[in-house]
Design a protein with these regions (language model features):
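Acidic, PIN/NYN-like endoribonuclease modules and their adjacent C-terminal/linker elements
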Residues: 1-2, 17-33, 126, 138-183
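Short, well-structured N-terminal submotif of metal-dependent ribonuclease cores
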Residues: 1-60, 68-81, 177-179
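Anionic, Ser/Thr-rich low-complexity intrinsically disordered regions
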Residues: 9-10, 48, 56, 83-122, ...
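Short alpha-helix boundary/capping motifs
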Residues: 35-38, 91, 131
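Residue-level marker for well-ordered alpha-helical positions
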Residues: 39-42, 94, 135
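Short glycine-/small-residue-rich flexible loop motifs, especially phosphate/cofactor-binding loops
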Residues: 45, 98, 138
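Active-site neighborhoods of divalent-metal-dependent phosphate/nucleic-acid chemistry enzymes
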Residues: 102-154, 158
Length: 183
């Protein structure tokens, strides 16, 4: 099975691996505690890495760092030079994503003009209000011929059965716990 991972799955996995990362997943999602969410992400990465084909977009690197930076910056308001000093802390999660990619044999797909064109051709993404980053992830999953798109994002999950890969197959969109049941 060709499995595409949205950024949220990496955040799920890394949220229990570092004190700053824990800020990214501090509340329940769909009745699951952050520790359970992280465990589901780990099991999914392991399973896909062993017997399936996994991929994500290079956009994931930007999104994880920016998400952590925003949270750290909120807590450092009013502190001189905080923005500069927070960059190394936020950048560390990008390094961690690279390690996850290597540990679980996940391909990192380029964001190309073709990906942007594909995004622009997907009228459903526009009419359903799917914003730029999510739309680029959806287009990348389509181009990858994903059969399963795993996401923590409701906007992406609501695209279940709507996205069609280049082979003409509908893409199933699931959160980590339900993706594990499918695989």
């Amino acid at each position: 099975v060709r499995v595409y991972f949205d950024t949220g799955v990496f955040i799920d996995y890394l949220s229990t691996r570092g004190s700053a990362n824990a800020l990214l997943r501090s509340s329940e999602r769909r009745g699951r505690a952050p520790a359970d969410i992280a465990a589901d992400a780990e099991r999914l990465f392991e399973k896909v890495g062993r017997i399936h084909i996994g991929a994500t977009s290079c956009l994931t690197y930007y999104e994880v760092e920016e998400a952590l930076y925003r949270l750290l910056a909120q807590s450092a308001k009013g502190i001189s030079r905080a923005e500069t000093l927070l960059i190394p802390a936020a950048r560390s999660i990008t390094t961690q994503v690279q390690i996850v990619v290597e540990l679980f044999n996940i391909s990192v797909l380029d964001l190309t003009p073709g990906t942007v064109r594909l995004q622009l051709q997907q009228l459903d993404l526009q009419t359903r209000g799917i914003r730029a980053a999510d739309a680029l992830h959806a287009a990348t999953a389509i181009a990858f011929d994903a059969e399963l798109l795993v996401s923590a994002d409701d906007a992406i999950l609501n695209l279940d059965g709507i996205l069609v890969n280049t082979q003409g197959r509908k893409i199933v969109c699931r959160d980590t716990d339900l993706a594990l049941q499918l695989l």
